[in-house]
Regions:
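Extracytoplasmic/secretory-pathway proteins
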Residues: 1-103, 113-266
Length: 266
């Protein structure tokens, strides 16, 4: 396997929160494990598939060698090959050509490929939400979010969670629901899903991550018009926001939304 040029740490584009975030050495290793665990693959097929995945991690301009390889039709080797073609298109931002193989691979007899294909369909729709909403400077304009893509992403996420309730991407899908809420300005849903994530956090790091996210995007976001006051089905988040609004430095702001007696009465 040719590992020349593979960085031990993710590149800048791998940590900016975009579609490249999953193209890193950790996912490369997980892919290798799937190749090793699949007894139907020959050593030659494993090497070819592994080298292609390395090429994608290097973001190399070299042409893929996979199309010339004679993988048997409907074999697991072909499923892995088609999966790699899909993620190649995905990381290049060619979402229409990424979607085609993943739609077919949902029915694959290779279980890891079938599950991952369904997850990738969710991520394709997620990225399509903001495909035309980010300018050349990286600034996000929520008014240009693709609402149809957002609805499709939620539909595909629900489909994944229904098909794989204990799947390997459950936490990712649930977390990305909050990103969809933010992309579309559905702040009540963001509060609800954020409070749910707080209750499900199993480590201090996970809890801190959700709290920081809610504070930046919702509770402490001064650019929300109108500002977030509360959400009936999210009592903890609502109570936290009331406490913040009761602070003296907030109450004296000309743009402050004053806490009412009715709110305090519950």
């Amino acid at each position: 396997i040719n590992l020349d040029g593979v960085a031990l740490e993710p590149s800048y584009t791998n940590v900016d929160g975009g579609r490249w975030v999953s193209n890193n050495p950790a996912t490369l290793q997980r892919f290798f494990k799937q190749l090793l665990a699949d007894d139907s693959l020959t050593d030659e097929q494993r090497r070819a598939l592994a080298n292609e995945r390395v090429r994608l991690l290097r973001d190399s301009a070299e042409e893929s060698a996979l199309p010339a390889l004679p993988f048997p039709a409907d074999s697991h080797a072909q499923a892995f090959r088609d999966y790699l073609a899909g993620i190649d298109a995905f990381y290049r931002g060619d979402f229409s050509n990424a979607e085609t193989p993943f739609l077919a691979l949902k029915q694959s007899s290779q279980p890891w490929v079938a599950e991952t294909a369904q997850y990738m369909l969710f991520r394709i729709a997620l990225n399509q939400i903001v495909e035309d909403a980010v300018d050349d400077m990286g600034m996000f304009d929520r008014t240009k979010s693709n609402k149809a893509a957002a609805a499709l992403a939620l539909e595909r996420g629900d489909e994944y969670l229904s098909s794989f309730p204990a799947g390997q991407y459950v936490n990712s899908v649930q977390g990305l629901y909050r990103r969809i809420n933010w992309y579309t300005g559905d702040y009540n849903a963001l509060a609800f899903n954020g409070e749910k994530a707080i209750s499900q956090a199993t480590t201090p790091e996970a809890l801190q991550s959700v709290i920081n996210e809610l504070d930046a995007r919702l509770l402490g976001n001064q650019y929300l018009k109108p500002p977030f006051i509360g959400e009936p089905n999210s009592p903890q988040v609502t109570f936290t926001q009331v406490l913040k609004r009761l602070r003296e430095n907030y109450q004296t702001q000309t743009t402050a939304t004053q806490v009412t007696a009715e709110e305090l009465a519950g």
